[in-house]
Amino acid sequence: MNISYNWLKEYVNFDLTPDEVAAALTSIGLETGGVEEVQTIKGGLEGLVIGEVLTCVEHPNSDHLHITTVNLGNGEPTQIVCGAPNVAAGQKVVVATLGTKLYDGDECFTIKKSKIRGVESIGMICAEDEIGIGTSHDGIIVLPEDAVPGTLAKDYYNVKSDYVLEVDITPNRADACSHYGVARDLYAYLVQNGKQAALTRPSVDAFAVENHDLDIKVTVENSEACPRYAGVTVKGVTVKESPEWLQNKLRIIGLRPINNVVDITNYIVHAFGQPLHCFDANKIKGGEVIVKTMPEGTTFVTLDGVERKLNERDLMICNKEDAMCIAGVFGGLDSGSTEATTDVFLESAYFHPTWVRKTARRHGLNTDASFRFERGIDPNITIYCLKLAAMMVKELAGGTISSEIKDVCAAPAQDFIVELTYEKVHSLIGKVIPVETIKSIVTSLEMKIMDETAEGLTLAVPPYRVDVQRDCDVIEDILRIYGYNNVEIPSTLKSSLTTKGDCDKSNKLQNLVAEQLVGCGFNEILNNSLTRAAYYDGLESYPSKNLVMLLNPLSADLNCMRQTLLFGGLESIAHNANRKNADLKFFEFGNCYHFDAEKKNPEKVLAPYSEDYHLGLWVTGKMVSNSWAHADENTSVYELKAYVENIFKRLGLDLHSLVVGNLSDDIYSTALTVNTKGGKRLATFGVVTKKMLKAFDVDNEVYYADLNWKELMKAIRSVKVSYKEISKFPAVKRDLALLLDKKVQFAEIEKIAYETEKKLLKEVSLFDVYEGKNLEAGKKSYAVSFLLQDESQTLNDKMIDKIMSKLVKNLEDKLGAKLR
C-alpha cells in the first residue's frame, strides 16, 4: 500500500525523515519495502520551461511541419521544428529543453538535438499528454498571455514533491489499511521512544443538515451481512474537476483523479480506511435504498460493463425496482454519479467480512473496497467518514446537505475485553518490561484500561483491532511497539524440545530412505496438500465421502485435502511429459487426510478427521536409454518392486515375515499389497490403470507405490540391527526346475522354502520363467535357485540332499509342484 509522507504528517506530528519513518514502521511490524521521491506530475517537469513563439513559418520540406523560433527567457531565440496544427507566433508554450526526460507510462525518452527533414530542432514544444498534465494530444499547450518566458514549468504548474512509502500490510492488520491507521501505529512508536507527538484528524463538528428536500429511506433486510448501513443526501451538486490539492494527493499515491465527487470517496478510503459509495440520488427508484440479497441467477451489470449472474448470498444495494451495487465490492453501471448528476446519496457502511470475501471470490473481483471490507474495517468510523464526505462534497461540489443521516445499526460494535497478566507478558516476551511501560504502550494504541490489579490489567480493545482479541495478541502489540531489538537474546535457551524419541528417529530414517532413492536416480517432489475433489469422483478406493473439504476454497482446483499422494505425482509426470521429459522417477513424503462420518462426536469435533504420513514412488518411461552398450529398455513393475524391497531391507524389515497379496481396483490394474502378519498395510505397488492415466493426459505406463510411513515406523520398532563377520565356510547353490499351475506366484515358493529351512537357507531367487510348447495346459515352469550356507561348518552332499528333498516334498504337497 502506498503511503504519502506529507499526508501522514497531517495526522501525526513528527520530525523524522522519510527513511527514518520507513525504519520506524518496519520495526513495529508494518514492513516498508521502499521509499520513493515522487512529484504530483511524473518527472516533476524537470527541464521544461515556459517559452514564447516569436516566429512560425512552414517547413519547406513538409506539408504539416512548422519551423519556429522560441524565446526561452535566456536572451537567445531557440529554433524548434513543431508538427502541431495549432502552433502560431505570439503563443506562450511549454518547451522541453535538451536533456529533458519525458515519460510515457513507465517508459521515458530524452530530448536531443536533431534534424527534422533537414532542419535543426533544439527542443520540443509540448502537448498535455507529453508532460503528464492531461490526456489531450490534439495540439500543443497554449498558455495565458501573462505566462512569463523562462519560468520553470514546475513552478508555473506548482508541482509538489513528496515521498511514497511502500508499506506491506499483512492480512490481519485491516486497521492499518489507511494513512490514519498507519499514523496510529507511528504515534505509539513516537510515544514509546520519548518523542512529543499528537494524533489528530479533521473535525466534523460543523456538519449540519440544511434542509430535508431529498429524504431517502434506508431498509436493511439482512443485518447479518450488513450490521451497519448509513447514508445522507447532498442536493444541487456540480460534478467537475477536483481542486489541485485533492488531485495531487491522489496522484502521489498512484490514483488517477476522476471528478470531485469520486475523488472525495477515494480520498476518504485512503485517509481513514472507510470505503464509500456515491449514488446518483435521482436514479434511486422509489426513494428507498434496500440492502438485501437477490434470487439465484439474477443478472446484474457492473461498472466494467460485465453482466454477472448473482448468487443468492451476494448482498446487494437495491432501490425499489433494481439492484444498484454489489455491496462492498463493485458498483453498478447505471446507478453511479456522472457529470450530469446534480443530487447524490452517499453510502457509508460496515459489511460482514465473510460475505464480502465470498462474493468477491465468486465474481473474481478485487477492489479497494473489497480489500478492506473482507479484512474487517472499523464499524464505529462509518458516521464520521460519512459526515466528512458530505462536508467535502458541499465544499468542493456545492449543494446542500438535504437529509438527516440514516443510520441503520443492528447493534453497536463492542470493545473486545482482554485480561492481561504481567507474568504472561514477561513469559512470552522473554524479558521483564516495566509496568508503566506496558500501560503507556497499550494506551498509546487506544486500548482502555478498565481495571488494574497488581497482577495485570483488564483492557478494552477497540473494535477496529480485529486481530487483537486474546491476551497473546495484546502481548504481540506490546512487543512490537516496545521494540524487538530491545529484547536481548539470552545466553541460554530453556526448551521443552528433546533430541530423542520416535519423531527424531522417523526423521532420520526418512532422510536415510530419501538419500537411498536419490542414489537410485529418483527426484523428490513436493506437491500441494490441497487438491481437486473431482479427482475422487466415482472412486471406490478413495471415496469422495472421505474427503476433508475446504469451507472457503480459493478455487475448484484446490477445494479439498488429498487422500493419496498419487494424483499430485501424476500431475508432475504430466507436466514433465509435456516438456519432453518422459523418463521419470519421483518420490514424495507427505500427509494424506481422511474424514469418517461414522466417527462424528459432538464432544470431540476432530474425531472424524485423521491424517497419515505416506511415501509415494512413481516410475515411468525408460529404465535404460539407448547407447553403445545397451538398447532401450522400458521400466517395469519389477523395477518398482525392487525399490520397495530395498527400502524395506534398508529399514531392517524381514521380508519373509511379511504377507503379500494381490490387488486390482480403480487405481491399479494389477498390484501387490504388503501387510504385517497382524494385517496392517505397509505398502501397495503396481501398475496404474489406463483410465486413471488418461484423466491426467499421461501416455506412458506409470508404476506407483504407496508406503504407509507411520505403519512402517511401528513395524520396525523391534528391529535390531546386528553385525557379524562374513562366514568362513563356502555357500552352496542348488537349482530346481519346477512345473506349477499358472496361478502360483514366486512369493509362495519363497515363503514355503524359508519355512522349510530356517537356518541354512540364505537366499531364494527366480532366474527363469517358461510358458509354451511341451508344457501341459495351465502350467508354467519356474527355474529357482537356492543358496545354502552353514556359519559353523562346510556343508556336505548328504546334508544338502536332505534339505533339497525336504524342499521338493513341501513344494509338491503345498503347491502341487513337480520336478521337470
UniProtKB/Swiss-Prot annotation:
UniProt keyword annotation of Metal-binding present: yes
Record CDD domains: PheRS_beta_core (cd00769), tRNA_bind_bactPheRS (cd02796)
SUPFAM superfamilies, sorted: Anticodon-binding domain of PheRS (SSF54991), Class II aaRS and biotin synthetases (SSF55681), Nucleic acid-binding proteins (SSF50249), PheT/TilS domain (SSF56037), Putative DNA-binding domain (SSF46955)
Primary location group: cytoplasm
GO CC terms in record: phenylalanine-tRNA ligase complex
Cofactor(s) essential for the protein: Mg(2+)
Cofactor remark: Binds 2 magnesium ions per tetramer.
Statement: the UniProt record of this protein carries the keyword Protein biosynthesis: yes
Classification via Gene3D superfamilies: 3.30.56.10, Bira Bifunctional Protein, Domain 2 (3.30.930.10), Ferrodoxin-fold anticodon-binding domain (3.30.70.380), Nucleic acid-binding proteins (2.40.50.140), Phenylalanyl-trna Synthetase, Chain B, domain 3 (3.50.40.10)
Domain FDX-ACB: 727-820
GO molecular-function term, one example from the UniProt record: tRNA binding
Pfam family, one: FDX-ACB
The EC number(s) this enzyme carries: 6.1.1.20
Domain tRNA-binding: 42-154
Location in the cell: Cytoplasm
Residues that coordinate or bind Mg(2+): 467, 473, 476-477
Gene Ontology BP terms: phenylalanyl-tRNA aminoacylation
Keywords, alphabetical: Aminoacyl-tRNA synthetase, ATP-binding, Cytoplasm, Ligase, Magnesium, Metal-binding, Nucleotide-binding, Protein biosynthesis, RNA-binding, tRNA-binding
Annotated catalysed reactions: tRNA(Phe) + L-phenylalanine + ATP = L-phenylalanyl-tRNA(Phe) + AMP + diphosphate + H(+)
Domain B5: 413-489
SMART domains: B3_4 (SM00873), B5 (SM00874), FDX-ACB (SM00896)
Quaternary data: Tetramer of two alpha and two beta subunits.
Similarity comment: family membership: Belongs to the phenylalanyl-tRNA synthetase beta subunit family. Type 1 subfamily.
Record protein name field: Phenylalanine--tRNA ligase beta subunit
Organism: Bacteroides fragilis (strain ATCC 25285 / DSM 2151 / CCUG 4856 / JCM 11019 / LMG 10263 / NCTC 9343 / Onslow / VPI 2553 / EN-2)
Lineage of the species this protein comes from: Bacteria, Pseudomonadati, Bacteroidota, Bacteroidia, Bacteroidales
